[in-house]
Amino acid sequence: MGDIIEGTKPTLDDLWAGDEDQKPQTPPVSPPRSPSFKHEHKSSFPGSTSPPPASPIGEEDLKPRTARASSSTSKVKSRKASPEEFKPVLIDDLPTAWDEAHETFEALEKCVYERKDIGLSKENDEMMVCECVYNRHDPDADPCGPDSDCINRALYIECIAGECRAGKHCHNQQFSKRQYANVDVVLTEKKGYGLRASSTIPANTLIYEYIGEVVAEKTFRKRMQQYADEGIRHFYFMMLQKEEYIDATKKGGIGRFANHSCNPNCEVQKWVVGRRLRMGIFTKRDVIKGEEITFNYNVDRYGHDAQTCYCGEPNCVGTIGGKTQTDIGTMNDLFLDALGITDEVEAMGMKGSKKKKSRQLDEDFVPILRPISAHEVQKVAAAIRQSMENKKMMSRLLQRIQMTDDGAMHRQLMRMHGFSLMYMVLTELADDNEIVLLALESMNKWKLQIRNKIEDSKIEEPVKALSQSGDEKICGLAKQLIEYWSTLELSYKIPRVSKIASLDADDEAGTQTIAEANVVSAARRPDAWENTQEIQIDIAPVRPRTLPVSRPRPPPPPPPLPVKKPALNSMSSTDRLKLDAIIAMAEQTVQAQAAAAAVEATASPQAGSSRSGSRPAEDEERRKRQKRTHMTEEELAEQKERRLRKLIGAVVVKSMNKYKDMMEHDTFKKYARECTDTLVKKEKKRNPSYQDVKHPSLSDDKKAKIKSFTKDYTHKILKHLKEKGKLRNPKSSSSLRTNSNDPRQAASSSTNGDTPSISTTPSQGAIQRLRDGELVDDIFGADEDMVMDLDEDTPEMQNDHPAPPSVPPATPPLPPVHVEVVDNVSTPTSQWET
């Protein structure tokens, strides 16, 4: 990054020149020649006093301009010299600077959000599913890849794992799987740190996600002024969507080090990943090894003043900043292709340079719009999704759709989720009558046979709202569409299991706020910061081991003797122990059978005495049952609330248990109760029918919501304790961690597979569940009534008279054992005969 232009220190008023009631859609950038950093207010701000954009250009207005434009284009093409061969500049001689660059900011593995309700995408669920299928008979198939016909990839929507029909062969999950390119961080001569390709990178490859703190516009403006006051020379703001920005100035990923170029090899793209909108740096062409990774800052990145550009490209405009979204020189290639003006822009040299100013869309360059052709459908659909913050671009794209009469193009647009795109247009830009009118006129030409797409896209909702509009033309078109759609029939399709329904829960669990990240900060650096350089370590000399004394080889064993009936005194100690164990078990079996027979013989005369001996226990149980039978309604309601409280408390304690070592035990119990009480109140308010259920339970979805709420609640507690200095350091090792050298653990495992095992050691998970249950009882108390209710539901408790004492089942007798011992074999073999 270059040095900023010298001038007076900017203030917040200087950064946002204009009326107080103005709310800019994009952050301002000072023009390069303004020493006072004053932003020249233009029509890029909605609600400005400047005249509104011109209405759509009619055919009569385009006639003279069309002729002049075509003639001038032909002249320019005839004068245009043959292009020189492009040779990228390599920076493979620069040293890597991973560690030095890491000291300048705090690394994040993924974006963190000021609130969880920002950074959300506006797409319908219907747009999340593509049509790609993996063909196992085609080894060269690339489902959902860059060269495929994947709808999701064309619209910058990432496929959902488990939902895409290509399965594990899907190539459109770069963000979720963190499939980043192989790059290095280097220190440049004039531009600060930069990124360099460590290997050849193909076109349309994700270099790195642009990671940072996602903040709202109010926070963005405050940070702009704060960074200026702190003397920070380079800002790293990127506009995610309307009134939402990614700030990678102090926290982010290595994508922040990608430098600017007026002829970049990469571009910034906004992708829908699950429920979130995320930004990534993608290659526009093949990038060779040693080439610097660059993209154009003039539209995608924002700062408070312009800076000198050091890209060194032939078409360098000289400065970074001061450009608008309608500047042809910085316009994304996607929009040029979608407007169908790429060839015209290149032929007339409209992108500008240091000596020539670039053209402005609809100001000094009015494009000649034509109907959409087949190869442009995907570009137009993708450009519409990317133009929700650019009304002027959206108007031009909708004009192309409106003037297209080819039914085949209409079907292709509907296949590219055209109705869902129009739903976004009518909901996000409903205040612009020109755009709304163009959208309605376009959809009025789309012919359907069934209304499934209408239902899936939910387009009927905004159209019904427009049917009540005060504009007669908009109202008439909306009613006409609703009437036409009502004549269509809905086709039934067999529904398949979808994972889209779980996206909300996954997003809630996987999204972290800035406050949570500040409390639970990762101590280690992400994998991208691992130092791959060779490190030499001096190891202390180790005393050589003494060689074992060579011993003579034993003589060969004698020939085997004939098998004889084993004598008891010739058996080894292991054989004797095994035989003793078998004999003891057989004796136990005989004794158990004899005891069972004796009990059966004496059951009748002793029945009365056994009942009289257990009379106190029976009286106590009968007293508890009578007490519950005569409970008042208030007592029953209190009992059910206590059960619900303990049921929710068990999930809360389990979720908070990982932070138990960071606070005192009494403090942990206090906040666990408070969190549980809050959730119980919410559950009682939302689901009053819990009182009708005798044994309440929680669904998996509700447990997930409780865990998410508990996680946020615990993070706030930890932050509060940290501010008061009461936060304890977590223990270095868990008390439940198993020591592999523990002799007790070794003793619990059997040394011989043939020896019967008498007892087993409970697993670590069982111990943890037992301890969690004890902790829940310690916090909320044991519920004896619940245990008694469960006992009543069993068949034994349904009778008024208790059952006689049960006798343990007799152990089945063991089959006779015949042991054969061979003298020349060290381990005897036991043969079980039935």
Swiss-Prot record:
Domain SET: 181-298
Highest taxon listed in the record's lineage: Eukaryota
Biased composition range(s): Low complexity: 541-550
Biased composition annotated in UniProt, kind: Pro residues: 25-34, 551-563, 802-816
Compartments reported by the entry: Nucleus; Chromosome
Molecular functions per Gene Ontology: histone H3K36 methyltransferase activity; histone H3K36 trimethyltransferase activity
Biased composition (Basic residues): 720-729
Keywords: Chromosome, Methyltransferase, Nucleus, Repressor, S-adenosyl-L-methionine, Transcription, Transcription regulation, Transferase
Name listed for the protein in its UniProt record: Histone-lysine N-methyltransferase, H3 lysine-36 specific
Originating organism: Cryptococcus neoformans var. neoformans serotype D (strain JEC21 / ATCC MYA-565)
